């Protein structure tokens, strides 16, 4: 048993510690919420000294930023897969909206981190911002496919996603009572109403 942590530390010295810490943080995040993440606890999870953690993540904000970035990357992949075979415009937007909801449902605490108070207020984490833009671009392409004037696509996309996020959050918090079997249809209907509202 004692040999396992030693082997892990050896692997980490070759550059895998940041990835292992992000994985550990995401596991704790989903189990206990964002406030449960402690750099010292993550060091224990990874079997390393806490000083090794601080070399990669000077504070919890930097770790949260990378967790959020991972979340947005995963969301972007889901959105692209969901819309790959859909016609531009409403069909793509509905598919993306349902995928957005499913991602939030599957990883609610990560979704709350991604959609909560902005992590990148000071612009310290450009790769996080790039991941957000990559995901939201799927919705922008969807709106461009509706024939919307190019000059307003970005603004209307932002409004749409903000409204969709609100609907999804209300479902996750059980403020909107939606039975799980009916959730996809509910999101699709809400999406169509939101499209009309911002068009």
Residue ranges and their predicted role:
Residues 79, 103, 121-147, 154-159, ...:
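Amphipathic alpha-helical packing segments from all-alpha helical-bundle domains
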Residues 20, 28-62, 66:
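Helix-turn-helix
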Residues 1-16, 27:
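N-terminal intrinsically disordered/low-complexity leader segments
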Residues 66, 80-109, 132-134, 150, ...:
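Hydrophobic alpha-helical connector segments
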Residues 161-179, 194-199:
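Amphipathic C-terminal alpha-helical segment
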Residues 17-25, 42, 67-75, 79:
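Generic hydrophobic, amphipathic alpha-helix propensity
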Residues 105-123, 169-177:
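Amphipathic alpha-helical segments used for helix-helix packing
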